């Protein structure tokens, strides 16, 4: 079962990825983890990627596709894999198809931008312990203070509203076109494309995914 997850940052992909991995016994392939592992293992592609990254440049699509192919040939991918965060653009999707990496199911988790902004910009963290709160969904007992220590809570830079909106802008520009791209591939009968309402509870989304992909 070869699955790809699509959705904006903050849509809840990470939670569902965890569920899918456990339910179907497939590994999650995240390009970031894969790059780090290849560099650490010192594979030829890893060494090439290290050279590029050390020079402060972006790793090319070609190199990433090579790493994906190397990764999915490993034993733990025998039953399939879960791609998260790749491909991000149409050229990457084209390159992936051209290199023979097939996908069975594309899962899109759809959450309106304003809901994502509310979810992410409402997060508060206690820096000392890593405890996470949310001003709406999981507020601390005393506003702005950690329940255990009474110390001040902070907003992570990634959760600042301006940062969240910027990341959403990049997503709509680069990755959202993949929704249409894979919709067309699905029409040709080459894979199934399912869109889920990510504003539902985590359990409801997980249940809907199982119903759709079996």
UniProtKB/Swiss-Prot annotation:
It is found in: Cytoplasm. GO terms for cellular component: cytoplasm. Gene3D superfamilies: P-loop containing nucleotide triphosphate hydrolases. Keywords: ATP-binding, Cytoplasm, Kinase, Nucleotide biosynthesis, Nucleotide-binding, Transferase. It catalyses: AMP + ATP = 2 ADP. It comes from the Bacteria. Its main location: cytoplasm. One of its GO terms (molecular function) is adenylate kinase activity. AMP binds at residues 31, 36, 57-59, 85-88, 92, 156, 167. Residues 122-159 are annotated as: LID. Pathway: Purine metabolism; AMP biosynthesis via salvage pathway; AMP from ADP: step 1/1. GO terms for biological process: AMP salvage. ATP binds at residues 10-15, 123, 132-133, 200. InterPro entries: Adenyl_kin_sub, Adenylat/UMP-CMP_kin, Adenylat_kinase_CS, Adenylate_kinase_lid-dom, P-loop_NTPase. Its EC number is 2.7.4.3. It is an enzyme of class 2 (transferase). Residues 30-59 are annotated as: NMP. Monomer. Consists of three domains, a large central CORE domain and two small peripheral domains, NMPbind and LID, which undergo movements during catalysis. The LID domain closes over the site of phosphoryl transfer upon ATP binding. Assembling and dissambling the active center during each catalytic cycle provides an effective means to prevent ATP hydrolysis. Belongs to the adenylate kinase family. Catalyzes the reversible transfer of the terminal phosphate group between ATP and AMP. Plays an important role in cellular energy homeostasis and in adenine nucleotide metabolism. This is Adenylate kinase. It comes from Shewanella loihica (strain ATCC BAA-1088 / PV-4).
